[in-house]
Amino acid sequence: MVTLTVELSEELANALAQFVKRVGFSEMRSNAVDDFEAYLIRDALDRVRIGLANAGFSPR
């Protein structure tokens, strides 16, 4: 398990939260070497989204 701690301005945190909300699987797949890696990327971004939501950045 890897734990990441980052410091972001509110502007950056909000922009990142918007990105992880909007990015679709097709973009993930087009940047992955195969489907398996695309699913790993999706799962990792979901954890980032949860972390941002826990910090108060959860766009609708």
Where are these predicted regions, by residue range?
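Positively charged, low-complexity terminal tracts
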Residues: 1-7, 11-60
